[in-house]
């Protein structure tokens, strides 16, 4: 199943009678509750959440033509945790420059990236799959560290 981000936020708040302070993303508890609801109502361990706020997505995420405040992007949640993030990328040079500038970033810093757009970047998308996250959920681990051979955090950078 899939659900828009704004609808998912409202659904979790309404069904579980909970208020969450984070407006541009899910809090971990919201992801768990949304997955619990989807599992109960559809039987699926997976749910695609689409149309995240533009302010929360990277500069290369394409804004929706219908509503530029949201992006043509998604997260795939699995058993209460985000395991994949992806979406359509901006392929138009002018649109990409405008988005970089609107974020207060310096266009010059992205010249090598923008070169591809100037030459005619085709429509494209991408995603990132968190294999450790997926493995942790698949095996029922509460902590992703248990699914990583060499876990890293703010206190550990080398094995």
Task: Locate predicted features.
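Metal-assisted phosphate- and nucleotidyl-transfer catalytic regions
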Residues: 1-79, 103-115, 119-121
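Active-site pocket scaffolds in enzymes
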Residues: 87-88, 93-159
